[in-house]
């Protein structure tokens, strides 16, 4: 069969798209809410020319924040409720997490969120250059085996397009409880054009002042792992 999008780059995707069966209510949230929360034409089938999203039209000129891999959506909804004058795009390929987020959005009544249920690289394709004012990468999949480290988010394949999408001076927050992920983050993120802002140990040992702890973080703490909270800033040219 001929590829309808011959210019589409080959991108391996690792990880699950779906886990356990969704509840009836979650299926309803997906059917009723997901399309309304789209940030715009992201998928190749609807935007084969990779035309940049019109974020001003979609969000009314608000600052744009981005969370890559929002899990169950606790942090995303918290930030949306705390920052109503900001528009936040959440990207998550795991449909169970997306369904959980939609339930939280309904419960919280927030109206400044958009959701892309797919690969962040496809979203990066169509984010306008310099459009993102703040980005979050919180407890990403650690891919603990050495041969799988290239699958981690903190690689050139992800960091370069993220850097392009962020405005000069924009903040990039990374949280992880995996020591080797800290190491790779500290090696790769500065090389991609970001400056680490820590001045004291407390800057990475203590969470941000607007932080809300997630289910994953609570599990990590119960199991004796130590969270690290790293703050970077896109260097100005």
Swiss-Prot record:
Keyword hit for Phosphoprotein: no
GO molecular-function term, one example from the UniProt record: tRNA (guanine(46)-N7)-methyltransferase activity
Active site: 141
A GO CC term assigned to this protein in UniProt: tRNA methyltransferase complex
Keyword vocabulary terms for this entry: Methyltransferase, S-adenosyl-L-methionine, Transferase, tRNA processing
Known pathway: tRNA modification; N(7)-methylguanine-tRNA biosynthesis
Binding site for substrate: 145, 177, 214-217
Enzyme Commission (EC) number: 2.1.1.33
Membrane-crossing segments per the record: none
UniProt-listed InterPro entries: SAM-dependent_MTases_sf, tRNA_(Gua-N-7)_MeTrfase_Trmb, tRNA_methyltr_TrmB_bact
Catalytic activity: guanosine(46) in tRNA + S-adenosyl-L-methionine = N(7)-methylguanosine(46) in tRNA + S-adenosyl-L-homocysteine
Binding site for S-adenosyl-L-methionine: 67, 92, 119, 141
Enzyme class at the top of the EC tree: transferase
Family: Belongs to the class I-like SAM-binding methyltransferase superfamily. TrmB family.
Stated role: Catalyzes the formation of N(7)-methylguanine at position 46 (m7G46) in tRNA.
Name used for this protein in its record: tRNA (guanine-N(7)-)-methyltransferase
Organism in which the protein naturally occurs: Jannaschia sp. (strain CCS1)
Gene that this polypeptide is encoded by: trmB
